From Swiss-Prot:
ADP-ribosylated at Tyr-151 by PARP1 in presence of HPF1. Residues 238-251 have a biased composition (Basic and acidic residues). The modification N6-acetyllysine is found at residues 30, 52, 245. Keywords: Acetylation, ADP-ribosylation, Cytoplasm, Differentiation, Isopeptide bond, Nucleus, Phosphoprotein, Ribonucleoprotein, Ribosomal protein, Ubl conjugation. It comes from the Eukaryota. This is Small ribosomal subunit protein eS1. It comes from Felis catus. Belongs to the eukaryotic ribosomal protein eS1 family. Residues 228-260 are annotated as: Disordered.
């Protein structure tokens, strides 16, 4: 019995305090080329050790970034989720993974004396991504209206919801993911819905409030490189060491931004 006790004691005394951060590396996170600001931030990962490879620990990480940080503008109530799909050198290349409205924006729109209309739809893009889009809109007073409330009849609500679903389906079905994200950035879909429903009942605050990624096609590096504005170099890069190629393309960031 005593033997075991002393053995345990010895083990406790020997333990050295190792700073866990000494085993970790910082990686840069890069957003796709559709956004103005490509450098989102940094992320930590434990260095490659034995069978545990660092890049595997990074793949699948989701970063939630405000649109204001991606586009350098003031409107900050849209949040985009970006997922790491590939690691090249010290860069994590991300792809669109979803969109959301901030809680405070959502709560500020919901008020009394108006009807809230919500719709959702599952659509597949032309390049095989299955998205679920949620839309929200609110009725508003007509210009000459005196009555305090502006409630839509159930029939009108159903018509508006049908229109919402039609427009969302149409806008996504005919485009690939890149185009869809380009539409989500200024939320042109919401504006289209607002215009289309004007004849049924005047709406305001119409937004695609959320986009979920349900299914993705098989991962292709070439497609991801195209998203990151390096489509031309990706063909050549496959033969040589990819790390150096990407580093170079990365050094040329300002001109890339101007073209966007």
């Amino acid at each position: 019995k005593n033997k075991r006790l002393t053995k345990g004691g010895k083990k406790g005394a020997k333990k050295k305090v190792v700073d866990p951060f000494s085993k970790k590396d910082w990686y840069d996170v890069k957003a796709p080329a559709m956004f103005n600001i490509r450098n989102i931030g940094k992320t930590l990962v434990t260095r490659t050790q034995g069978t545990k490879i660092a890049s595997d620990g990074l793949k699948g990480r989701v970063f939630e970034v405000s649109l204001a940080d991606l586009q350098n503008d003031e409107v900050a109530f849209r949040k985009f989720k970006l997922i790491t799909e590939d690691v090249q050198g010290k860069n994590c290349l991300t792809n669109f993974h979803g969109m959301d409205l901030t809680r405070d924006k959502m709560c500020s729109m919901v008020k009394k004396w108006q009807t809230m209309i919500e719709a959702h739809v599952d659509v597949k893009t032309t390049d095989g991504y299955l998205l679920r889009l949620f839309c929200v809109g609110f009725t508003k007073k007509r210009n000459n209206q005196i009555r305090k409330t502006s409630y839509a009849q159930h029939q009108q609500v159903r018509q508006i919801r049908k229109k919402m679903m039609e427009i969302m389906t149409r806008e996504v079905q005919t485009n690939d993911l890149k185009e869809v994200v380009n539409k989500l950035i200024p939320d042109s879909i919401g504006k289209d819905i607002e215009k289309a429903c004007q004849s049924i009942y005047p709406l305001h605050d119409v937004f695609v409030r959320k986009v979920k990624m349900l299914k993705k096609p098989k991962f292709e590096l070439g497609k991801l490189m195209e998203l990151h504005g390096e489509g031309s170099s990706s063909g050549k890069a496959t033969g040589d060491e990819t790390g150096a190629k990407v580093e170079r393309a990365d050094g040329y960031e300002p001109p890339v931004q101007e073209s966007v």
